[in-house]
Regions:
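Terminal, low-structured helical/coil segments at or just beyond the last alpha-helical repeat
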Residues: 402-407, 411, 420, 462-513
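Soluble catalytic regions of membrane-associated enzymes that act on cell-envelope
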Residues: 210-381, 405-424
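Alpha-helical transmembrane segments
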Residues: 20, 67-69, 108-109, 131-135, ...
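Internal/C-terminal transmembrane anchor helices
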Residues: 188-215
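Short hydrophobic alpha-helices at membrane interfaces in multi-pass membrane enzymes
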Residues: 31-37, 60, 71-87, 115-124
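Membrane-interface micro-motifs in multi-pass membrane enzymes
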Residues: 2-20, 24-74, 93, 97, ...
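Perimembrane helix-loop-helix junctions
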Residues: 100-121
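Cytosolic-side transmembrane helix boundary signature
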Residues: 157-198
């Protein structure tokens, strides 16, 4: 989980060190660390924005490296030639970052009062021609993406002002380093004051800006997603104790319970809020599409998992997403559509991080026996509906029950259907479900929450309880629950008492939510 922060820290550190080299070439006798840390701070702040692309920070580093190398060229003719070569290369690598480089080149020549400085305007003109030409040729869709850092933000959203701050800091830092007194023989006291003032200013800016831009609300979601990605189900469950007010968190939690086979037994031990917590509403975003694809895959609804994986792949900013490609590989292997799976595998094989995974899954191509023997793909293929139909057209519960009847050994479809009814408080539908399937291979015994719901269906009919083999522990617990309610009927603290003593039961959920 720390690889990402380490990579970002390494990039930002490299930016700070390269900025220092640039500033020292202009003012070699001063440690003006305020100038070379400001871009680092602003780039750090924009990293917190979910819609920002880290490519923008990498491009900024390439710009600084190029500028630092260019400034070390002494001969103005070679310097001009190098700038004219670097600008199109930077545009090819990082788009509008080439404009920041060309502007810095012209500015550096201007503040250096170079006799040939006028000729360096050709670098800026070259960049303008490249940018305009890229839009005219439709290589880039908008002038905004050719000339502004908006290219490194979600294309359909307006970029925040913060994204421009680091870009503005670079030319201002060049000017600041030039105009600041050189002071070769400056006293230690004055130097100490300068460093202290800069240090205080940096600390103040960090104190003001980091809490403002650091999106702590999104952090728990990122944690849950990491544990889901690495299949650490117990960690997800551990992080979801206490109040939960977000359907996305609940979807992660309920998926973890389902993966462990504990959904119908333990779901009411957590802060449930209706059936939306089983499957969050789809909002056409990459995050929710990916989450739903994973949840449907756990559930065995392969068609819906494939649909959500594709939606996630096409809605993510950038050039697709390997996580969704992995799911598309799996779903197509399960369906036996091997040519499509092979196409996606070929894409993943070209990546560094997913090459081994893709190579391993290539072994499943056109190999039904290998798929059926695989612990992940095999059960999913076995649970596919025998008759072709449109998934979800008659409701998810209808599809789940077809699969439950077809593969009774897999208890998740029937338990998930019951969970939908209980969370919706649709007791009539739940009653029809258990009366039809209880005692059959589809539902040989009732999970704990189902037993608790049976008592609510017929609170005074003990024979009805016996029909569904409600356990003695559940009956004794209900007796305590009923006594608590009767004894505190007029007590305004009754909800708190129920929550404290019976908060992990369906009776508490049914009464209080």
């Amino acid at each position: 989980p720390y690889a990402g922060p380490f990579i970002i820290a390494a990039i930002l550190t490299s930016i700070g060190l390269t900025m220092r080299e640039i500033i020292l070439q202009i003012n070699p006798n001063k440690e003006l660390f305020l100038l070379y840390l400001l871009p680092v701070l602003f780039l750090l702040l924009i990293q917190y924005d979910f819609n920002y692309l880290v490519q923008g920070t990498i491009a900024f580093l390439f710009c600084l490296i190029s500028l630092n190398a260019w400034m070390r060229i002494k001969d103005p003719r070679y310097r001009l030639s190098a700038a004219l070569v670097i600008t199109p290369l930077l545009f090819w690598i990082g788009g509008p970052i080439a404009g920041l480089f060309s502007l810095s080149v012209v500015l550096k020549e201007a503040i250096s009062r170079s006799k040939q400085g006028f000729y360096f305007l050709a670098v800026l003109i070259e960049y303008l021609f490249i940018g305009i030409g890229s839009v005219w040729s439709t290589t880039i869709t908008s002038y905004r993406f050719a000339f502004l850092p908006d290219a490194f933000y979600h294309p359909i959203l307006a970029a925040p002002n913060l994204i421009y701050f680091a870009w503005v800091c670079l030319p201002l830092s060049l000017i600041g380093a030039f105009v600041y007194p050189k002071g070769k023989n400056q006293s230690k006291k004055k130097t100490g004051i300068e460093l202290t003032v800069q240090f205080i200013l940096i600390l103040f800016l960090c104190w003001v800006t980091i809490p403002r831009y650091n999106d702590q609300k999104a952090y728990p979601l990122k944690v849950l997603d990491y544990y889901a990605r690495t299949e650490q189900w117990d960690e997800i469950i551990r992080h979801c104790h206490g109040p939960i007010k977000n359907y996305l968190y609940l979807t992660y939690l309920n998926r973890a319970l389902a993966e462990k086979g504990e959904l119908a037994d333990r779901m009411f031990a957590f802060d449930q809020h209706g059936p939306q917590g089983l499957l969050a509403s789809w909002n056409k975003t990459f995050t929710v599409s990916t989450l739903l694809s994973d949840a449907y895959f756990t559930l065995g609804e392969i068609a819906l998992s494939q649909e959500m994986a594709f939606e996630g792949y096409v809605t993510v900013i950038g050039a697709g997403n390997p996580r969704n490609l992995q799911r598309l590989v799996q779903t197509n292997l399960i369906y036996g559509t091997y040519p499509i799976a092979e196409k996606y595998i070929s894409i993943l094989e070209k990546t560094y991080a997913y090459h081994d995974w893709a190579k391993r899954h290539r072994g499943f191509l056109y190999n039904d026996k290998a798929i059926e023997a695989d612990p992940v793909l095999g059960p999913k293929r076995k649970a596919l509906p025998k008759e072709s139909n449109l998934s979800g057209i008659n409701g998810l519960e209808h599809d789940l029950l077809i699969r439950a009847e077809q593969d009774p050994e897999n208890q998740l479809p029937i338990q998930f259907t019951g969970a939908i009814y209980l969370l919706s408080k649709d007791m009539k539908a739940f009653q029809r479900l258990i009366e039809k399937y209880y005692g059959t291979p589809v539902l040989p015994s009732l999970p704990v929450s189902f037993q608790e719901a049976v008592i609510l269906l017929a609170e005074k009919d003990v024979d009805y309880w016996k029909r569904f083999n409600v356990s003695g522990n559940v009956i004794r617990k209900f007796a305590g629950y009923r006594n608590l309610v009767v004894q505190n009927r007029n007590n305004p603290q009754l909800p708190q008492l129920i929550k404290k003593s019976f908060g992990d039961t369906y009776w508490s959920y049914y009464t209080l939510k």
